[in-house]
């Protein structure tokens, strides 16, 4: 996670903010769309980066959305924190954006696609992408990745795009600590919107759906007043209101920390 309440992280955050303030001093903090080439399909933002220069962001290759192994396919380290208008208190997790940098000589101007996997609270701009080092460097001209990363903070343009995870179906990772009266699951790899705004669970031999609640990030939980009876079907709803049902995707012999792949997927 990019934000921590530990003393060490607080000092790092203060240092990062001071650096951002100094770098941003070269141009107004409240810049307008007129600073960029007019393009109605793109919005303006600022970008920073964190973690290793060629890493996926967090040291544990995770983040505030709960995704695992973001250094591997399909994330492939092309990840980003989003501030609240992008992160949306966790409901923006998994959404995909095209980004391209401007106003720096090392910028290629070519769009790159990133996935929201983490959050940030730094007061940089209305829209702020705190990118992995890999994603930040990907916006550079060939051979100028490090030069662009050394800029620290840059102007970018961005737009929301459909997610597309070739060869993958919606996947459910049962979280550690789940038991017969507490069930928590990470939802990932949704094409289209990429995000999830609601998850519902149906027990075996039941005809009704029980709403789960967002635990944090893309992890949803159900605290039950009775022992849950598997197999479970899960129904997910994305930001557009489209629903998918993964029938009996969680088997009767489910286990914490196990991954269960469905046979369903949104159209991208």
Swiss-Prot record:
Q: Name one GO biological process term.
A: plant-type cell wall loosening
CDD domains per record: DPBB_EXPB_N (cd22275)
Keywords linked to the UniProt accession: Cell wall, Cell wall biogenesis/degradation, Disulfide bond, Glycoprotein, Membrane, Secreted, Signal
Q: What is this protein called?
A: Expansin-B3
Expressed, tissue-wise, as follows: Expressed in roots, coleoptiles and internodes.
Signal peptide coordinates: 1-25
- Domain Expansin-like CBD, chain residue ranges per copy: 181-262
Which residues are in the Expansin-like EG45 domain?
62-168
Look up the record and report any one GO term of the cellular component aspect: extracellular region
């Amino acid at each position: 996670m990019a934000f921590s309440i530990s003393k060490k992280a607080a000092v790092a955050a203060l240092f990062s903010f001071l650096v951002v303030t100094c770098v941003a001093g070269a141009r107004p903090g409240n810049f307008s769309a007129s600073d960029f080439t007019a393009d109605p399909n793109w919005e303006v933002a600022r970008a920073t980066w964190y973690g290793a220069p060629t890493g996926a962001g967090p040291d544990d290759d995770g983040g505030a959305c709960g995704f695992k192994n973001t250094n591997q396919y399909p994330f492939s380290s092309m990840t980003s924190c989003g501030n609240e208008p992008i992160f949306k208190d966790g409901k923006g997790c998994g959404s995909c954006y095209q980004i391209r940098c401007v106003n720096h000589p090392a910028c290629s101007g070519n769009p790159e696609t990133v996935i929201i996997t983490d959050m940030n609270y730094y007061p940089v701009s209305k829209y702020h992408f705190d990118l992995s080092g890999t994603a930040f460097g990907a916006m550079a001209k060939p051979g100028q990745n490090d030069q662009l990363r050394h800029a620290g903070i840059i102007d970018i343009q961005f737009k929301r795009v459909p997610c597309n995870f070739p060869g993958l179906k919606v996947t459910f990772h049962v979280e550690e600590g789940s038991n017969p009266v507490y069930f928590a699951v990470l939802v990932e790899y949704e094409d289209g919107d990429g995000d999830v705004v609601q998850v519902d669970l149906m027990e075996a031999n039941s005809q009704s759906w029980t709403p789960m609640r967002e635990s944090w990030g893309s992890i949803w939980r159900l605290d039950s007043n009775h022992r849950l009876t598997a197999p479970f079907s899960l129904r997910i709803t994305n930001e557009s209101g489209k629903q998918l049902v993964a029938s009996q995707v969680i088997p009767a012999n489910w286990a914490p920390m196990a991954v269960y792949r469905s046979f369903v997927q949104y159209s991208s």
